[in-house]
Protein backbone atom coordinates (compact mmCIF):
# COMPACT_ATOMS: atom_id res chain seq x y z
CA UNK A 1 0.00 0.00 0.00
CA UNK A 2 2.85 2.42 0.79
CA UNK A 3 4.23 2.46 -2.72
CA UNK A 4 0.76 2.85 -4.24
CA UNK A 5 0.39 6.25 -2.57
CA UNK A 6 0.26 9.39 -4.70
CA UNK A 7 0.43 13.02 -3.62
CA UNK A 8 -3.37 13.19 -3.97
CA UNK A 9 -3.72 10.43 -1.33
CA UNK A 10 -2.11 12.52 1.40
CA UNK A 11 -4.30 15.04 3.22
CA UNK A 12 -1.93 17.04 5.39
CA UNK A 13 -4.70 19.30 6.72
CA UNK A 14 -6.76 16.41 8.09
CA UNK A 15 -3.69 14.27 8.94
CA UNK A 16 -5.11 11.48 6.81
CA UNK A 17 -3.87 8.99 4.21
CA UNK A 18 -6.37 7.76 1.63
CA UNK A 19 -5.55 4.12 0.84
CA UNK A 20 -7.07 3.29 -2.54
CA UNK A 21 -4.66 1.06 -4.42
CA UNK A 22 -1.59 -1.14 -4.43
CA UNK A 23 1.18 -0.73 -6.95
CA UNK A 24 2.51 -4.08 -8.12
CA UNK A 25 5.11 -5.46 -10.48
CA UNK A 26 5.72 -8.96 -11.80
CA UNK A 27 8.06 -10.52 -14.34
CA UNK A 28 5.20 -10.58 -16.83
CA UNK A 29 3.85 -7.10 -16.15
CA UNK A 30 6.28 -4.31 -15.22
CA UNK A 31 3.78 -2.12 -13.31
CA UNK A 32 0.08 -2.38 -12.57
CA UNK A 33 -2.37 -1.03 -10.03
CA UNK A 34 -4.80 -3.21 -8.10
CA UNK A 35 -7.30 -2.33 -5.40
CA UNK A 36 -6.48 -3.59 -1.90
CA UNK A 37 -7.23 -7.28 -1.31
CA UNK A 38 -10.62 -6.60 0.29
CA UNK A 39 -13.20 -3.82 0.18
CA UNK A 40 -12.14 -2.99 3.75
CA UNK A 41 -8.65 -2.26 2.45
CA UNK A 42 -9.97 0.94 0.87
CA UNK A 43 -9.87 3.30 3.82
CA UNK A 44 -8.69 6.57 5.33
CA UNK A 45 -5.87 6.11 7.82
CA UNK A 46 -5.08 8.83 10.38
CA UNK A 47 -1.47 10.03 10.48
CA UNK A 48 0.53 10.65 13.62
CA UNK A 49 2.53 13.88 13.72
CA UNK A 50 5.68 11.83 13.06
CA UNK A 51 4.21 10.19 9.95
CA UNK A 52 2.87 13.53 8.74
CA UNK A 53 6.30 15.16 9.11
CA UNK A 54 7.98 12.24 7.33
CA UNK A 55 5.55 12.40 4.41
CA UNK A 56 6.02 16.17 4.17
CA UNK A 57 9.76 15.53 3.78
CA UNK A 58 9.06 12.88 1.13
CA UNK A 59 6.81 15.23 -0.85
CA UNK A 60 9.31 18.09 -0.55
CA UNK A 61 12.30 15.94 -1.54
CA UNK A 62 10.55 14.09 -4.34
CA UNK A 63 12.34 15.04 -7.51
CA UNK A 64 10.13 16.29 -10.28
CA UNK A 65 10.43 14.08 -13.29
CA UNK A 66 10.43 15.15 -16.92
CA UNK A 67 7.76 12.56 -17.60
CA UNK A 68 5.48 11.33 -14.82
CA UNK A 69 4.97 7.58 -14.82
CA UNK A 70 1.37 6.71 -15.66
CA UNK A 71 0.26 3.32 -14.37
CA UNK A 72 -3.32 2.26 -15.06
CA UNK A 73 -4.42 5.90 -15.03
CA UNK A 74 -2.53 6.79 -11.83
CA UNK A 75 0.42 9.16 -11.59
CA UNK A 76 2.23 11.21 -8.97
CA UNK A 77 3.51 8.24 -6.98
CA UNK A 78 5.41 9.45 -3.92
CA UNK A 79 8.28 7.00 -3.98
CA UNK A 80 10.46 6.85 -7.08
CA UNK A 81 13.63 4.95 -7.89
CA UNK A 82 16.76 6.60 -9.33
CA UNK A 83 15.36 6.43 -12.84
CA UNK A 84 12.14 8.19 -11.82
CA UNK A 85 9.97 5.08 -11.91
CA UNK A 86 7.65 4.21 -9.02
CA UNK A 87 9.05 1.93 -6.36
CA UNK A 88 7.31 -1.32 -5.44
CA UNK A 89 7.47 -3.49 -2.30
CA UNK A 90 10.49 -5.38 -3.66
CA UNK A 91 12.57 -2.18 -3.39
CA UNK A 92 11.91 -1.92 0.35
CA UNK A 93 12.49 -5.64 0.89
CA UNK A 94 15.85 -5.41 -0.89
CA UNK A 95 16.82 -2.33 1.13
CA UNK A 96 15.93 -4.06 4.39
CA UNK A 97 17.87 -7.17 3.36
CA UNK A 98 20.90 -4.94 2.64
CA UNK A 99 20.68 -3.29 6.06
CA UNK A 100 20.42 -6.72 7.67
CA UNK A 101 23.51 -7.89 5.78
CA UNK A 102 25.50 -4.82 6.85
CA UNK A 103 24.50 -5.34 10.47
CA UNK A 104 25.47 -9.00 10.39
CA UNK A 105 28.81 -8.17 8.76
CA UNK A 106 29.57 -5.37 11.23
CA UNK A 107 28.58 -7.27 14.36
CA UNK A 108 29.21 -10.85 13.29
CA UNK A 109 25.79 -11.93 14.51
CA UNK A 110 22.79 -13.12 12.55
CA UNK A 111 19.58 -11.16 12.99
CA UNK A 112 16.04 -12.31 12.31
CA UNK A 113 14.78 -11.51 8.83
CA UNK A 114 12.72 -8.33 8.93
CA UNK A 115 10.37 -7.58 6.06
CA UNK A 116 7.69 -4.94 5.51
CA UNK A 117 5.13 -7.61 6.39
CA UNK A 118 6.90 -8.32 9.69
CA UNK A 119 6.70 -4.58 10.44
CA UNK A 120 2.96 -4.70 9.72
CA UNK A 121 2.58 -7.47 12.34
CA UNK A 122 4.71 -5.46 14.79
CA UNK A 123 2.62 -2.33 14.25
CA UNK A 124 -0.62 -4.24 14.76
CA UNK A 125 0.64 -5.90 17.94
CA UNK A 126 2.00 -2.65 19.39
CA UNK A 127 -1.20 -0.71 18.67
CA UNK A 128 -3.33 -3.49 20.17
CA UNK A 129 -1.14 -3.62 23.29
CA UNK A 130 -1.38 0.18 23.57
CA UNK A 131 -5.12 -0.31 24.01
CA UNK A 132 -6.81 0.46 20.69
CA UNK A 133 -10.14 -1.35 20.44
CA UNK A 134 -10.39 -4.33 18.07
CA UNK A 135 -12.81 -2.76 15.56
CA UNK A 136 -10.65 0.36 15.17
CA UNK A 137 -7.55 -1.80 14.77
CA UNK A 138 -9.32 -3.95 12.18
CA UNK A 139 -10.21 -0.77 10.27
CA UNK A 140 -6.65 0.60 10.47
CA UNK A 141 -5.23 -2.65 9.13
CA UNK A 142 -7.81 -2.83 6.35
CA UNK A 143 -9.03 -6.27 7.35
CA UNK A 144 -12.54 -7.40 6.45
CA UNK A 145 -12.69 -9.65 9.51
CA UNK A 146 -11.52 -8.94 13.07
CA UNK A 147 -10.41 -12.56 13.42
CA UNK A 148 -7.64 -11.92 10.86
CA UNK A 149 -6.50 -8.92 12.90
CA UNK A 150 -6.51 -10.84 16.18
CA UNK A 151 -5.51 -14.35 15.09
CA UNK A 152 -2.89 -13.52 12.46
CA UNK A 153 -1.53 -10.03 13.07
CA UNK A 154 -1.45 -9.56 16.85
CA UNK A 155 0.94 -11.54 18.99
CA UNK A 156 1.19 -11.93 22.74
CA UNK A 157 4.10 -12.72 24.99
CA UNK A 158 4.21 -13.58 28.66
CA UNK A 159 5.53 -10.08 29.36
CA UNK A 160 2.65 -8.35 27.55
CA UNK A 161 0.07 -10.54 29.29
CA UNK A 162 1.77 -9.90 32.62
CA UNK A 163 1.68 -6.10 32.07
CA UNK A 164 -1.99 -6.20 31.09
CA UNK A 165 -2.85 -8.40 34.06
CA UNK A 166 -1.06 -6.05 36.46
CA UNK A 167 -3.18 -3.16 35.16
CA UNK A 168 -6.44 -4.92 35.97
CA UNK A 169 -5.36 -6.91 39.04
CA UNK A 170 -6.51 -4.19 41.44
CA UNK A 171 -10.03 -4.43 40.03
CA UNK A 172 -10.37 -8.15 40.74
Residue ranges and their predicted role:
Residues 5-8, 122, 151, 156:
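Structural detector for helix-capping/boundary residues
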Residues 45, 61-86, 90-139, 143-146:
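Short, basic (Lys/Arg/His-rich) helix/loop patches that form interaction surfaces
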Residues 28-33, 130, 151, 155-172:
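DNA/chromatin major-groove-contacting recognition/catalytic segments
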Residues 4-63, 70-74:
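Conserved tyrosine-mediated DNA breakage-rejoining catalytic core shared by Y-recombinases
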Residues 14-19, 115, 126, 138-156, ...:
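Short functional hotspots where side chains directly engage DNA or cofactors
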Residues 20, 48, 80-82, 154:
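Residue-level detector of conserved, well-ordered beta-strand and adjacent loop positions
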Residues 1-4, 136:
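Acidic donor-binding helix in nucleotide-sugar-dependent glycosyltransferases
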